[in-house]
Amino acid sequence: MAQHGVFGEIVSAEGAYIHNLLPFWDAYWKNPDGSDPEKLGWRMKYNKENRGDVYATHGLGPVAQALDIHRGDRFKTLVAMDTKSVVGRNYVKQHTGKDCPEYRNGDQTTTLMRTENGKMVQIQHNVMTYQPYNRLYKLIGTSGYATKYPEPRFALDGGAIKESGVPQVDKLDTHNFMSKEQQDALVSKYEHPILKKYGAIAKEVGGHGGMDYIMDARMIYCLQNGLPLDMDVYDLAEWCCLAELGTLSMDNNCAAVSFPDFTRGFWNVEKGFKHAYAAPEDEAHAAAAAKASTEAQKQLTLKKKLWEKYDKEKAKAAKKAAKK
């Protein structure tokens, strides 16, 4: 929808990772090498020792693509703020029986970014407090609005509704979301090709509601067809540096921090984020080749009983570890 201009020009976006992890903290890996003497588990320990949005990619990735970051725009300035740590400190105290005078990460961190083209992004991180799971995913455009949580909803001005070919079933103004009938028609019209291809089987297979399957299938599709991936190395740098830049901001009284241009000036060369697709005949050829390769590997596994070799090597490694 964003790529087809349904919301007009998107001027602001929000994303988040809001997930109360209290039921899960104790399940995270506890490194036996002595680096975690309190046995907090790697994730709680990391939050204890590091300040900032330490899990930014969930919230930032989708909105960065919707805003064409380094494909016509770039992040320019960042400011981050956090709350004090209450829940985190209390957890450590309850877990260890000792006070926790130093806990770096706040219960909630909010990061604001402004782009070269004057747009704004807000990203939140909160894995401590009691609230429903939420990744926000809000797009605010000159002609419309979309939000993902707590359920997908849309609001479009009259002109945008007409241009989208959605039936005008009742009078809408800027205070109302679209009716279910209108929303269903809008979603059906703009259903993404990737969802059309993998949506049904993804729901059947599962894995974070099918998201895992779709991401894996899409990556494999791109590799099999020799296509660029949906995320590149610049996305990796831009999305992940939020933690370090946010720390710099907050450790300096929430000062503004310049966002590095990882593209070294080439952020405006490619225009607009796009998914790459193979021609139907090339796609069919790649799928057939992949199927044949998989079948050949299965036959080789059966012929050489490769699982037995794997089990032997695994047993050797276990004995070696036990001797240490």
Q: How should these model regions be labeled?
A:
Residues A64, P132-I140, Y145-P150, G158-K324:
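C-terminal helical cap and adjacent loop that interface with cofactors, partners, or active-site loops
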